[in-house]
Swiss-Prot record:
Lineage: Viruses, Varidnaviria, Bamfordvirae, Nucleocytoviricota, Pokkesviricetes
GO cellular component: extracellular space
GO MF term set: serine-type endopeptidase inhibitor activity
Signal peptide interval: none
Protein name per its UniProtKB record: Uncharacterized serpin-like protein FPV040
Keyword Transmembrane helix appears in the UniProt entry: no
Length: 337
């Protein structure tokens, strides 16, 4: 299995759905979502598990090994990653507990109240820029929907080497820079001119093959460049139940055949919430993913949303581990006020 292809495919499926709801700023943690759904599959009946693997395009024969490779890489000095499975009035056997812990970094705890089955996946990432931004920020005035806001743009004090590529066919550029003493790579893709129609063309060009092409180091060159990125703090939250249903995975009612006693439960909520902050010294992203199942037939209503944010020129970003290539985050940011 091609790990990065699977992760980008999941990210794009989620991105396309969230964009269709009218949400403008989108932050996705594909590894966390894949891990959460695959951990859930260890408790469900075979039919549901197979549907999960199908929408993720993952071979079920190697699923535990695949997830172990991802999750072993998800804890470091820059990443804090863990998942908790809370069980109320049900239990699982020791073999399943061991698989969840060793391959999915999921510890199992007994709960006395609340949902019958609840997964909570937490990903906290913070990395220093290889070179902090020391120059004064550039203030930009942004006008949108008859409103005016000001954004502070972090700018390198002097030119330095980055990996660059011009996408002349769509009027955009790709910039790759290293984080945390070269342990991670941040790729940004943005229009050369601050025009909405160019960014719309860029967004419409997003697919797995195009992203893999854009981040291909062999097609880039080292060049002197001043990195510019907005100084922001923003939040986003997405409902995943309807997204999964649109992909053919209906989790509204699930048979849990690998818990004792065997039971059928209804979804309470499946949601991802993220906070992103970009500062002169570092970049941080924190994400919670919750999957809750109860006897209640009526789920909570969770709407996709993002905080009002001003970012200046819009851009796509991809955050990867340099060694493994894992796509830790994928996002699209634009003014939303």
């Amino acid at each position: 299995m091609d790990i990065i292809k699977i992760q980008l495919d999941v990210a794009i499926k989620i991105y396309n759905y969230i964009k269709s709801t009218g949400t403008e700023n989108i932050i996705i943690a594909p590894c966390s979502i894949i891990s959460s759904l695959c951990a859930l599959s260890k408790l469900t009946d075979h039919s549901t598990a197979d549907k999960i693997y199908d929408i993720l395009n993952i071979e079920c024969q190697n699923i535990d090994l695949y997830m172990k490779k991802i999750n072993d890489n998800m804890n470091s000095s820059d990443i804090d990653y863990f998942c908790k499975l809370g069980l109320n009035n049900v239990c699982i056997n020791q073999r399943t507990k061991n698989i969840l812990y060793n391959c999915y970094k999921t510890c199992t705890v007994d709960e006395t109240e609340g949902c019958s089955i609840k997964f909570k996946n937490v990903l906290e990432f913070e990395a220093l820029w290889n070179r902090p931004f020391t120059a004064p920020t550039e203030e930009q005035i942004r006008k949108r929907h008859n409103s005016v806001e000001i954004v502070s743009i972090l700018v390198d004090a002097k030119r330095r080497l980055h990996m660059l590529r011009r996408l002349d066919n769509i009027g955009c550029s790709v910039v790759r820079t290293s984080l945390a003493s070269n342990r991670y790579i941040l790729t940004t893709i943005s229009p050369n001119e601050d025009k909405e129609e160019i960014f719309n063309l860029l967004e419409n060009s997003i697919n797995v093959d195009s992203l893999l092409d854009w981040i291909d180091n062999s097609k880039m060159k080292k060049a002197q460049h001043r990195l510019k990125i907005p100084k922001i703090k923003m939040s986003s939250s997405y409902d995943i139940v309807e997204l999964l249903k649109s992909l053919g995975l209906n989790l509204m009612e699930i048979k849990f055949s690998n818990v004792f006693p065997e039971t059928t439960l209804f979804v309470e909520r499946i949601a991802q919430s993220s906070i992103m902050e970009i500062k002169a010294e570092s970049i941080s992203l924190n994400t919670d993913i919750e999957l809750e199942f109860t006897n209640n037939e009526y789920p909570k209503i969770n709407c996709s949303s993002c905080s009002e944010t001003v970012v200046g020129k819009p851009f796509i970003f991809i955050l990867q581990c340099r060694v493994t290539g894992n796509c830790i985050y994928f996002g699209v940011l634009r003014d939303s006020f």
